[in-house]
């Protein structure tokens, strides 16, 4: 069933332009969402070009059914496995570009039934793929107080993590939470100092969502896989929405652009040096949305686009 939730693709032209599309190229859109990037890529491909799109959200897979273009293939699964999908199709080292639009999408946030938002009451779920893994409610009910505090601090940078974790555990002992509003209310009550511009539950909801979906591990795995999937000259175009995501992408591109770091003065033969390989990426810079895009779509404000190119080594 087609959903009616509006989704405005952030940095649409910039991210696709970063792929440097060739008409007969082979591309991966690792985060199909509602197909904004995929449709633009397809519009720039010739008859022999190919686009493989990936998403683990069943609603995104349903939306992809609207695209009947023979050059397009949709894959239901996590983008962390993009290298496996490429290898299964005999495309290892042959991909001309990979695009990733990280984080949660507007349709996921806006649909109360998905449980991502503290602004809309719904089931306390938060899974990108509701058919797999445990929901936020299930995890919070079973987790130790110290584990909850760790997640809130690490993935939400929440300064009241311990206090909020204690309140969550105490509430679940009385009556297990099953709704997003219940969790938001517990967090609100446990937060001693309120931010004038941000709901107290913002950081905690982000942290729990990242943990439930293993989002940062997914990114790290996808980045490593991209190196084996891309051909020389192939592009990597990645949009991040918060500092935790961008830090991983930035560090990866920097490290792969630098090549192996060898301690000064360490004796090595030419063969040993050669076996270490050279740099595998060339970082091509970053972009942020302009004022007009942020005005049209406030969720674009924190987005960062980073582009890199696979080297021949």
Curated annotation (Swiss-Prot):
Enzymatic reactions: cytidine(1402) in 16S rRNA + S-adenosyl-L-methionine = N(4)-methylcytidine(1402) in 16S rRNA + S-adenosyl-L-homocysteine + H(+)
Keywords for the protein's UniProt record, in alphabetical order: Cytoplasm, Methyltransferase, rRNA processing, S-adenosyl-L-methionine, Transferase
GO BP annotation list: rRNA base methylation
SUPFAM superfamilies linked to this entry: Putative methyltransferase TM0872, insert domain (SSF81799), S-adenosyl-L-methionine-dependent methyltransferases (SSF53335)
GO molecular function annotation: rRNA (cytosine-N4-)-methyltransferase activity
Signal peptide positions (record): none
Any one of the GO CC terms: cytoplasm
Primary site of residence: cytoplasm
Coiled coil residues, start to end: none
UniProt EC number: 2.1.1.199
Family: Belongs to the methyltransferase superfamily. RsmH family.
Function, as annotated: Specifically methylates the N4 position of cytidine in position 1402 (C1402) of 16S rRNA.
Protein name: Ribosomal RNA small subunit methyltransferase H
Gene name linked to the record: rsmH
């Amino acid at each position: 069933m087609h959903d009616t939730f509006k989704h405005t693709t952030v940095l649409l032209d910039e991210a696709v332009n970063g792929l440097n599309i060739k008409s007969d190229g082979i591309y991966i859109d690792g985060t199909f969402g509602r197909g904004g990037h995929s449709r633009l890529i397809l519009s720039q491909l010739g008859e022999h070009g190919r686009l493989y799109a990936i998403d683990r959200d069943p609603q995104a897979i349903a939306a992809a059914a609207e695209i009947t273009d023979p050059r397009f293939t949709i894959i239901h699964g996590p983008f962390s496995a993009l290298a496996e999908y490429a290898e299964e199709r005999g495309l290892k080292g042959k991909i001309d570009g990979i695009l990733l639009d990280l984080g949660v999408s507007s349709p996921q946030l806006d649909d109360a039934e998905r449980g991502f938002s503290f602004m809309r009451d719904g089931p306390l779920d938060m899974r990108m793929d509701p058919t797999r893994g445990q929901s936020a409610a299930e995890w919070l009910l079973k987790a130790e107080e110290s584990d909850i505090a760790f997640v809130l601090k690490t993935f939400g940078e929440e300064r009241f993590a311990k206090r909020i974790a204690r309140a969550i555990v105490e509430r679940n002992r009385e009556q297990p939470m099953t709704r997003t509003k219940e969790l938001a209310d517990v967090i609100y009550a446990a937060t001693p100092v309120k931010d004038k511009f941000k709901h107290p539950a913002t950081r905690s909801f982000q942290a729990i969502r990242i943990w439930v979906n293993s989002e940062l591990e997914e990114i790290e795995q996808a980045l490593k896989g991209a190196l084996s999937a891309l051909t020389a000259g192939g592009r990597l175009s990645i949009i991040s929405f918060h500092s935790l995501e961008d830090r991983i992408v930035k560090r990866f591109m920097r490290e792969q652009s630098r090549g192996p770091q060898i301690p000064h003065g360490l004796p090595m033969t030419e063969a040993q040096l050669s076996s270490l390989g050279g740099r595998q990426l060339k970082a091509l810079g970053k972009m942020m949305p302009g004022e007009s895009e942020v005005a049209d779509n406030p969720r674009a404000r924190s987005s960062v686009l980073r582009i890199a190119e696979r080297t021949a080594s």
